[in-house]
Amino acid sequence: MISFNTSTRHTFKIVVSTDSSVQMTEEQKKNYFNTGNLNDIQVDDKASWFTLRTLSIADREQAEIKAGAFTRSELGKLLWVEAPNDTRDKALWHNRLSDEEKEALAKYEKYLDRSYLEYAKASLVAINDEEVNSDILDNLSPADKSNVIYEMVIHLTRESTLSESGK
């Protein structure tokens, strides 16, 4: 059973694996994403530390509404769920979609990207212990923005949801 953390007062710190001041193997990265544990990972003094707060169910719903939950493509959502996991199979599957289906899928994927950005903005408290306005994420380069948001959401999801043993 999985349940959401009901407290939004819990904060935690992360570093982003693509930060040049952070050195980790793929196995260490996988473990870090799953546990948040930085043991055996080399983190230089120049690394950027992000302080995040957990999000309640209401916070997550509000972020999804801001991202367009009521106008997202339901056909796109259905196709996204049905898409194969294997890269080659997915490419072949995607190629067989009609133009209308491809457009619906693209719209849904854009909605997911907006949702992740809204989750990240709602959870960001500080960078390097300095309080920041969450709009600072909009100032990142596109490549950095994608990586930072993706990793923030991985850690945020882990910290905002508790397994039965985590209660």
PLM segments and residue spans:
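Short, intrinsically disordered N-terminal pre-domain segments
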Residues: 1-17
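Intrinsic disorder/low-complexity segments
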Residues: 19-21
